[in-house]
Amino acid sequence: PITLAIQCSKLNIHYTYLGTGCIFLADDPTKSMYNEDALPDFFGSSYSVVKGYTDRLMHNFNDSVLNVRIRMPITADYNPRNFITKITTYSKVCSIPNSMTVLPELLPIMIKMMESKKVGTINLTNPGLISHNEILQMYKEIVNPKFTWENFTVEEQNKILLSKRSNNQLDNTKLKEWYPEVLPIKDSIRKCLEDMAIHNTTKNGGGCSIN
């Protein structure tokens, strides 16, 4: 990414880097937010260390690079990379409020940013927080009434994982100034789950019905 950023800067070419917001850690995401200028403070996994370092380097190209931070990407597909699919298949879930990205809504907005050649860092997550339990409760209400799950604590989770998990709330002030139509996270996820239920995406595939 850095080589591309350097070359694009030299050639006056707009460059979009799709990074992550999983480079921060808050003890209580409901009480603090990270804006676009915040420095990475989560080093609990090699992934976050590399991504955090890259995020810092991208700030050196604020005149030519759009540095996009996404978190816990969500769609209406039963895809193993979909955050909803992941947590519905876990044996136990550690429920913590987090910022998340509903891709069918926010990817088109990212394309608009690219077309208008916006630069700098942007927290591309839906405004607000939602917990794992809130998502699973909606999943049970909308998609599968028979679904059940079991919780465990952060301490219990850390004992079985090879690396720790990032939990945080990203500040969406800039995003809402640029695109005020972006839905709050709970509303956007509900639309995805309604699409799952209607279109039976386990067989047919599909995205959230968000225009």
Predicted regions and their residues:
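NAD(P)-cofactor binding segment of oxidoreductase domains
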Residues: 1-16
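Helix C-cap/helix->beta junction micro-motif
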Residues: 7-11, 61, 143
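Catalytic helix-loop patch of NAD(P)-dependent Rossmann-fold dehydrogenases
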Residues: 14, 22-68, 75
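Active-site beta-alpha turn of Rossmann-fold NAD(P)-dependent dehydrogenases/reductases
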Residues: 19-21, 69-71, 125
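Short glycine/proline- and charge-enriched loop/turn segments
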Residues: 31-41, 85-91, 156
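NAD(P)-dependent short-chain dehydrogenase/reductase
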Residues: 56-108, 112
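Residue-level signal for the nucleotide or nucleotide-sugar donor/cofactor binding architecture
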Residues: 98-101, 130, 170, 180-183
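Mid/C-terminal beta-alpha module of Rossmann-like enzyme folds, strongest
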Residues: 109-167, 191, 200-211
